[in-house]
């Protein structure tokens, strides 16, 4: 045996001893089993990975921005590159964002990446939840993961809101003031919430530090914990899978060498997996196949965010200028994912503001439209798996066309959010049509109820008729086959 061969054997023995030592303490064999876990080859399942990678990009770009951002409303003399503010006293938070944008190398690009990653994060979570809803992937035993996903959707919106409040320009300050008014409108505990989240009556010197703390620590930790819980539940329960058209044939028996055959959830392969058998998942092994797919998704997500950052500008704080308590921007609108809440605030009539007799608790339209109704919407979403409940565990996804009333409810809900979002842009709509908001708002109020109900009923009727026609066709075919026999 050559010296090189002896060294190779010694290295292998040393490696085995190290692995045995680590395995005895950390159970590495269970990790090796996970590497063979099956992931269905479904493109729509990758939306969850897009959300995960967007969160990673948000953390990385946020770390860069956090090194230069100053969470303070104290006035400082601006001495940066923007000529219009040269030598003026501006809030330190505003000055630091100008410094990041115009003076730090790649600062504008990183800020844009952070912005678009946030939008893509919210969008991918929303699309992921729509996919899960319409395919019934929330059913038993996956109700807990649906609740976790709902919480993630709410936290993603909260992270975005606290983020665009930080520059403390005129737009951000106005949006922050709206949030403060909504928080303090909550009966009994409003003032406490206002002090906890906004540092007291707005504007306050504690507002930006408080929101910054929530934005960079509280919400990211909560999102990270929920993502970890989401992934642990997913690994424990295994993926849902689309119904199979036929039995899936592998190339080796279960426990054999890895092949391109029917990979199952236990990390092995089976010679035949019956199409009705949902106890195993047929798909790609976590390593190396799914890992390679995930790597491609990551780089595509990174490329998409980078392309958006390179070509599309973001909120121009230099145009709005620093916070001016005596003024209000001509046009204030939230980001698209909060537009529906803004629309509800605009459509609610003033008579919905009232005081409850005897107890003297005041209920304002701000509370109803900006807090109560959005909370009700998220509450309904969270408990939906318990409304559409199944005693038996379901591991195959469903065809939305075969779920008449569930699909109808989903269509109606989407229409409700869309109409409410349009109401949030009633000023722009009025300008485009040449009419005032006094004309548009009553129409939108009626549409907010009529359109969702009408579209839901129409969807239900169409799907029911389609199902009846399919049953009639199958009955006719069976009758013809019986006659032939």
Swiss-Prot record:
<keyword id="KW-0349">Heme</keyword>
<dbReference type="GO" id="GO:0009055">
    <property type="term" value="F:electron transfer activity"/>
</dbReference>
<feature type="transmembrane region" description="Helical">
    <location>
        <begin position="45"/>
        <end position="65"/>
    </location>
</feature>
<dbReference type="GO" id="GO:0005886">
    <property type="term" value="C:plasma membrane"/>
</dbReference>
<keyword id="KW-0408">Iron</keyword>
<keyword id="KW-1133">Transmembrane helix</keyword>
<feature type="binding site" description="axial binding residue">
    <location>
        <position position="215"/>
    </location>
    <ligand>
        <name>heme</name>
    </ligand>
</feature>
<feature type="region of interest" description="Disordered">
    <location>
        <begin position="244"/>
        <end position="273"/>
    </location>
</feature>
<feature type="transmembrane region" description="Helical">
    <location>
        <begin position="292"/>
        <end position="312"/>
    </location>
</feature>
<feature type="transmembrane region" description="Helical">
    <location>
        <begin position="146"/>
        <end position="166"/>
    </location>
</feature>
<dbReference type="InterPro" id="IPR005798">
    <property type="entry name" value="Cyt_b/b6_C"/>
</dbReference>
<dbReference type="Pfam" id="PF13631">
    <property type="entry name" value="Cytochrom_B_N_2"/>
</dbReference>
<dbReference type="GO" id="GO:0016491">
    <property type="term" value="F:oxidoreductase activity"/>
</dbReference>
<protein>
    <recommendedName>
        <fullName>Probable respiratory nitrate reductase subunit cytochrome b-561</fullName>
    </recommendedName>
</protein>
<keyword id="KW-1003">Cell membrane</keyword>
<dbReference type="GO" id="GO:0046872">
    <property type="term" value="F:metal ion binding"/>
</dbReference>
<keyword id="KW-0249">Electron transport</keyword>
<keyword id="KW-0472">Membrane</keyword>
<dbReference type="InterPro" id="IPR016174">
    <property type="entry name" value="Di-haem_cyt_TM"/>
</dbReference>
<feature type="binding site" description="axial binding residue">
    <location>
        <position position="128"/>
    </location>
    <ligand>
        <name>heme</name>
    </ligand>
</feature>
<comment type="function">
    <text>The respiratory membrane-bound nitrate reductase enzyme complex plays a role in generation of metabolic energy by using nitrate as a terminal electron acceptor during anaerobic conditions. Proposed membrane-embedded heme-iron subunit involved in a protonmotive Q-cycle mechanism-based electron transfer to the beta subunit.</text>
</comment>
<keyword id="KW-0534">Nitrate assimilation</keyword>
<dbReference type="GO" id="GO:0042128">
    <property type="term" value="P:nitrate assimilation"/>
</dbReference>
<feature type="transmembrane region" description="Helical">
    <location>
        <begin position="213"/>
        <end position="233"/>
    </location>
</feature>
<dbReference type="GO" id="GO:0022904">
    <property type="term" value="P:respiratory electron transport chain"/>
</dbReference>
<keyword id="KW-0614">Plasmid</keyword>
<feature type="transmembrane region" description="Helical">
    <location>
        <begin position="336"/>
        <end position="356"/>
    </location>
</feature>
<keyword id="KW-0812">Transmembrane</keyword>
<feature type="transmembrane region" description="Helical">
    <location>
        <begin position="116"/>
        <end position="136"/>
    </location>
</feature>
<feature type="transmembrane region" description="Helical">
    <location>
        <begin position="433"/>
        <end position="453"/>
    </location>
</feature>
<keyword id="KW-0813">Transport</keyword>
<dbReference type="InterPro" id="IPR027387">
    <property type="entry name" value="Cytb/b6-like_sf"/>
</dbReference>
<comment type="similarity">
    <text>Belongs to the cytochrome b family.</text>
</comment>
<feature type="binding site" description="axial binding residue">
    <location>
        <position position="230"/>
    </location>
    <ligand>
        <name>heme</name>
    </ligand>
</feature>
<keyword id="KW-0479">Metal-binding</keyword>
<feature type="transmembrane region" description="Helical">
    <location>
        <begin position="409"/>
        <end position="429"/>
    </location>
</feature>
<dbReference type="Pfam" id="PF00032">
    <property type="entry name" value="Cytochrom_B_C"/>
</dbReference>
<dbReference type="InterPro" id="IPR005797">
    <property type="entry name" value="Cyt_b/b6_N"/>
</dbReference>
<comment type="subunit">
    <text>Probable multiprotein complex; a catalytic heterodimer of an alpha and beta chain is proposed to associate with additional subunits involved in membrane attachment and electron transfer.</text>
</comment>
<feature type="transmembrane region" description="Helical">
    <location>
        <begin position="367"/>
        <end position="387"/>
    </location>
</feature>
<dbReference type="InterPro" id="IPR036150">
    <property type="entry name" value="Cyt_b/b6_C_sf"/>
</dbReference>
<feature type="binding site" description="axial binding residue">
    <location>
        <position position="114"/>
    </location>
    <ligand>
        <name>heme</name>
    </ligand>
</feature>
């Amino acid at each position: 045996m050559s010296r090189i061969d002896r060294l190779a054997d010694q290295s292998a023995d040393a490696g085995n001893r190290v692995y045995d030592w680590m395995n005895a303490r950390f159970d590495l064999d269970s990790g090796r089993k996970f590497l063979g876990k099956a992931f269905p080859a479904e493109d729509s399942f990758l939306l969850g990975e897009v959300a995960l990678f967007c969160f990673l990009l948000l953390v990385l770009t946020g770390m860069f921005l956090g090194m230069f951002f100053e969470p303070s409303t104290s006035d400082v003399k601006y001495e940066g590159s923007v000529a219009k503010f040269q030598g003026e006293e501006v809030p330190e938070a505003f000055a630091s964002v100008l410094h990041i944008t115009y003076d730090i190398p790649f600062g504008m690009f990183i800020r844009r990446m952070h912005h678009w990653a946030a939008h893509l994060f919210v969008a991918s979570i929303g699309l992921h939840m729509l996919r899960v809803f319409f395919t019934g992937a929330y059913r038993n035993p996956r109700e807990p993961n649906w609740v976790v996903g709902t919480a993630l959707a709410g936290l993603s919106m909260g992270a975005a809101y606290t983020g665009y409040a930080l520059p403390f320009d005129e737009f951000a300050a106005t949006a922050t003031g709206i949030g403060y008014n909504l928080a303090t409108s909550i009966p009994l505990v409003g003032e406490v919430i206002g002090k906890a989240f906004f540092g007291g009556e707005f504007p306050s010197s504690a507002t930006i530090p408080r929101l910054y703390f929530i934005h960079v620590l509280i919400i990211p930790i909560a999102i990270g914990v929920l993502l970890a819980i989401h992934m642990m539940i997913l690994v424990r329960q295994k993926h849902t899978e689309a119904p199979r058209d036929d039995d899936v044939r592998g190339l080796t028996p279960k426990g054999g060498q890895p092949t391109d055959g029917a990979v199952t959830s236990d990390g092995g392969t089976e010679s035949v997996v019956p199409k009705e058998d949902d106890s195993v998942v047929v798909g790609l092994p976590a390593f190396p196949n799914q890992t390679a797919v995930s790597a491609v998704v990551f780089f595509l997500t990174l490329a998409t965010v980078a392309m958006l950052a390179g070509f599309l500008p973001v909120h121009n704080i230099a145009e709005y200028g620093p916070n001016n308590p005596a003024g209000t921007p001509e046009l204030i609108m939230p980001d698209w994912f909060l537009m529906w809440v803004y629309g509800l605030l605009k459509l609610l009539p003033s008579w919905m503001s009232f005081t409850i007799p005897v107890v003297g608790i005041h209920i304002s339209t701000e509370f109803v439209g900006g807090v109560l109704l959005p909370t009700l919407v998220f509450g309904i979403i969270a408990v939906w798996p318990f409304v559409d409940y199944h005693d038996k565990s379901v591991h195959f996804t469903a065809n939305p066309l075969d779920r008449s009333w569930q699909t109808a409810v989903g269509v109606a809900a989407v229409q409700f959010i869309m109409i409410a979002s349009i109401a949030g842009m009633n000023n722009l709509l009025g300008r485009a049509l040449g009419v005032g908001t006094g004309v548009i708002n009553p129409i939108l109020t009626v549409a907010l109820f009529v359109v969702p109900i009408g579209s839901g009923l129409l969807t239900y009727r169409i799907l029911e008729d389609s199902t009846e026609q399919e049953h009639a066709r199958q009955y006719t075919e069976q009758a013809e086959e019986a006659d032939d026999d």
